[in-house]
Amino acid sequence: MPQHPRFRGEDFVWYEERCTGCASCAKFCPLGIIRIVTRPSGVMTKEGEKNALEVFDIDLARCMFCGLCVEACPYDALHMGSGFERARYTRKDLVINIDELRRAPKRPSTWFRPQLEAKGYNPHTDRPLEWHEVGRHEAPDLEAMQARWVEVR
């Protein structure tokens, strides 16, 4: 069955390389379905210290797929996925844990990332994307920045 690239599926795409363990996604979830437990890792990132994640659970049994967790993530580590076949017999099996998030196919929905759609990316037919390909904003090149400064002055 054909699906639109902006379809918000019942799975999540998580890029561990981008995640700092700040728990913004958990804080902004209106239903409180995201559980994160961290410990200091000592790894320095551009913005500050990165935490090591011990627990990262998403309870799909209660998720309403609003996407506020995706919008709240300042590092673009969490995205809505494009899968839709997560039927289970028990509610506890609907909890996605950190290992499942690591193994999940990296095919983010273009719902919150229209720049992916503008590039013609289709999560259902194209290859999985690496963490550096799904940023919220494209980094401008030097010429574009210089031209902007000239126009502003």
What would you call each of these model-derived segments?
Residues 5-7, 29, 87-89:
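A generic structural signal for short, non-catalytic loop/turn and secondary-structure boundary residues
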Residues 45-53, 60-153:
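Flanking helices and flexible, charged tails adjoining ferredoxin-like Fe-S electron-transfer domains
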Residues 12-32, 57-76:
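Cysteine-centered iron-sulfur cluster-binding motifs in ferredoxin-type domains/subunits
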Residues 1-11, 33-52:
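Short, charged low-complexity linear segments at domain edges
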